[in-house]
A protein has these predicted regions:
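Charged, alpha-helix-forming regions
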Residues: 1-260, 283-313
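Short, charged helix-capping/linker segments at alpha-helix termini
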Residues: 263-265
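Charged, low-complexity interaction regions
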Residues: 267-270, 293-295
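Short amphipathic alpha-helical heptad-repeat segments
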Residues: 274-282
Length: 313
């Protein structure tokens, strides 16, 4: 392994790449992600020259099986991307990697030659760009999950929007997919991405038709939540129920929880159940623990006793 090769936590790429039409598969895009990770935005690249990026073959093989590597590199070399400018109604076609070399001179590396124009394109982030976690990206085994992840991270970063809308035709175009109706697109693209996001990215992706022409879906509205958002909402819902509930019923429920899940002394139980402030704190912290917002390293009883101020002089 090349000791000088290091993966950075996040990738940065222009939004025009995120929203470009690409014909690459999941393995090609993993290699692309590894290459983008090696871009140095503080370096003064010569804009008149091509540049060679070197990826250790052993590093690439962690994410792309050796038997698929040549075909993936061939596709990266041969397939174009189309970059759209909707405002000006124009588009450009680019070949990012016109040349590559595999293990030249037994180097143990893949050498990707990036043209000067392609390098300028990749480095031109502007004020708005896409930032995503490389490790999460490399876990996806679906190209559609990869593409949706980039779009979601672009929207979250640039617009801080957890709700946004895209035309179905546009998504079908940039994803280069043949799923030409909403039902198939939802099943093959969106549902897969939603499952992958939940398992690998701590994101909850929801979607629904936004606009229709007759029965045909024209655009899709996306709603994004993190798993942490959902946990906070669960705590808030439980606290709202607590505030509305009959006080006597609350005491009975809290006492039952203490007996089943905690080992307070009788004096501590009495203090909690007979103090509205302590009882409210107990219910909220218990909810945060149960919903995963608080990770307990010792014991729930010890943590809550400390939070309630027991043992202080």
């Amino acid at each position: 392994m090349d000791s000088t090769f290091e993966l950075k936590k996040n990738n940065y790429q222009p939004n025009s790449l995120t929203l470009s039409r690409q014909e690459w598969g999941v393995n090609e895009r993993k290699i692309l992600g590894l290459l983008i990770n090696q871009l140095d935005f503080n370096r003064d690249y010569d804009p008149e020259k091509s540049h060679i990026f070197k990826l250790p073959i052993q590093e690439v093989a962690k994410y792309v099986d050796y038997k698929y590597m040549k075909a993936s590199l061939d596709n990266l070399q041969s397939c174009k991307i189309q970059v759209f400018n909707k405002e000006k109604d124009t588009f450009s076609s680019l070949v990012l990697f016109p040349e590559y070399h595999y293990n030249r001179d037994n180097s143990g590396k893949i050498e990707m030659i990036v043209t000067n124009s392609s390098l300028v394109f990749l480095l031109n982030l502007g004020k708005e760009y896409t930032k995503y976690n490389l490790d999460i990206f490399l876990q996806f085994q679906s190209v559609f999950s990869q593409r949706m992840y980039e779009i979601v991270m672009m929207e979250l970063k640039n617009n801080h929007r957890k709700s946004f809308e895209y035309e179905l035709d546009f998504l079908q175009q940039i994803f280069d997919t043949k799923y030409n109706n909403f039902a198939n697109f939802k099943l093959r693209v969106l549902d897969k991405a939603r499952n992958d996001f939940f398992e690998k990215a701590d994101l909850i992706l929801n979607y629904e038709p936004a606009k229709k022409k007759g029965k045909k879906v024209i655009s899709i509205k996306f709603m994004i939540q993190t798993a942490t958002d959902v946990k906070f909402e669960a705590v808030e819902e439980e606290m709202n129920d607590f505030r509305k509930a009959d006080p006597n019923q609350v005491v009975l429920v809290a006492k039952d929880i203490m007996l089943r899940e905690y080992k307070f002394s009788r004096e501590q139980e009495f203090m909690i159940l007979n103090s509205p402030d302590l009882l409210t704190t107990f219910v909220e912290i218990n909810s945060r623990i149960d919903n995963g917002l608080i990770k307990i390293r010792s014991s729930k009883t010890h943590y809550l006793a400390k939070s309630l101020g027991f043992g202080k002089k």
